[in-house]
Amino acid sequence: MTRRGCWPHRIIFSLILLTWTHVTLAALIRSHTFSNWPKPPCKMYYPIDPDYEANCPDVIALVCATNGLNYKNECFFCIDRWEFGPHIEFVKYGKCE
């Protein structure tokens, strides 16, 4: 019996292992700074009708604003900004410190 039959399995295993290692190390080494992210696209969340009740998604992606509040996500931040005025400004994604 020859050992040629196991070569495809070794090659596939090696390729999967190398890919997994590369992706894992890249994720660990790369810095995750939120300061490079763009500001929330608030125009997308502004209601067309003044009587419209906002229906923001139930997703937790914290947004910090200049009023010191942590908003659950950018939709809640944008709706608050629309209701209370442009003096509420975006600071960063993530929790306020």
UniProtKB/Swiss-Prot annotation:
This is Serine protease inhibitor Kazal-type 13. One of its GO terms (cellular component) is extracellular region. The keyword Secreted applies. SMART domains: KAZAL. Keywords: Disulfide bond, Protease inhibitor, Secreted, Serine protease inhibitor, Signal. Residues 36-97 form the Kazal-like domain. It comes from Rattus norvegicus. Disulfide bonds join 42-78, 56-75, 64-96. SUPFAM superfamilies: Kazal-type serine protease inhibitors. Its main location: secreted. It is found in: Secreted.
